[in-house]
Amino acid sequence: MRLFVGLGNPGTKYQGNRHNIGFMVVDEIARRHGFAPWRRRFQGEASEGALDQERVVLLKPATYMNESGNAVQDAARFFKLTEGDVVVFHDEIELPPAKVRVKVGGGIAGHNGLRSISAHIGNEYRRVRLGVGHPGVKERVHAHVLNDFAKSERPWVEALVDVVAENAALLVTARDSAFQNKVHLAMQAKGFVEKDAKGDNGGK
């Protein structure tokens, strides 16, 4: 069993924010793969289904970003899951727009949602880092992630959310490199990421 957590802030005010791309991904996973309707659970909204014949629970914490760990801990305890069973989808300013990287453990790069989760369940969970780009200077980061994606960005955002959801089953069995490669090649084919130098196919 796996717990897939999408990070974001609840409410229509934040719906289109860069910070909410994690919510967008788990919403699309639920839609694409026929998960059960969302219902209020674990200080958030949860939906159950299966990917690659493995039971998966999707979770959108309603605690606001900085307290995401409370909801994740509640769900993990209920299902008796370890941090290794948890996959977190989140915005990543240190990656260019439309890029995706997967890693287990490591630093939190100033992300308050990850900080909260690590404080509650430990650090060795899988993170799917969804690139939203950096505004250029540290002082603009807060406004950058709490603003909506620009109209010009929406095509790649919709494509990325779709491709990540399509290939989400690979994350259930920790086929992280295969997941990264499939997402990278699909986004490249759609013209949203440039062709890499020889030998770089979207790996870590």
Curated annotation (Swiss-Prot):
CDD domains with a match to the protein in the record: PTH
Protein name: Peptidyl-tRNA hydrolase
Function, in words: Hydrolyzes ribosome-free peptidyl-tRNAs (with 1 or more amino acids incorporated), which drop off the ribosome during protein synthesis, or as a result of ribosome stalling. Catalyzes the release of premature peptidyl moieties from peptidyl-tRNA molecules trapped in stalled 50S ribosomal subunits, and thus maintains levels of free tRNAs and 50S ribosomes.
Reactions accelerated catalytically: an N-acyl-L-alpha-aminoacyl-tRNA + H2O = an N-acyl-L-amino acid + a tRNA + H(+)
Principal location listed in the UniProt entry: cytoplasm
Cellular component, GO annotation: cytoplasm
Compartment list: Cytoplasm
Residues flagged as site, Stabilizes the basic form of H active site to accept a proton: 91
Binding partners and assembly: Monomer.
Gene Ontology MF: a single term: peptidyl-tRNA hydrolase activity
Sequence positions that bind tRNA: 14, 64, 66, 112
Keywords: Cytoplasm, Hydrolase, RNA-binding, tRNA-binding
